[in-house]
């Protein structure tokens, strides 16, 4: 299977430059599979799982949104954040989830209080 260039950039700099056989990710238009010689594409990327295949080996990542640009045999991803499954710190992720849930609860409580005051 023919390969194409994939370049992933984050706010911290170049994350990876690799030659891949296939790229799979979720864009704002839905799930997309990219192969060599794909038609030109520019789209937003959803916060989701992303994977690529190199010589039948699948590499999995968590991507924190961004943009993808495809032109012939070169694909560029500008990601807000990205981590391979090996890089994800499960304890840190659980703590971040707990903090986010707490913030949502606080916003809901404040919203309910404001609604009560207005009524």
Task: Specify the residue positions occupied by each region the protein language model found.
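Compact, glycine-rich, soluble single-domain proteins
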Residues: 7-99
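N-terminal export/targeting signal detector
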Residues: 1-5
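Charge/polar-rich, low-complexity and marginally structured segments
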Residues: 92-119
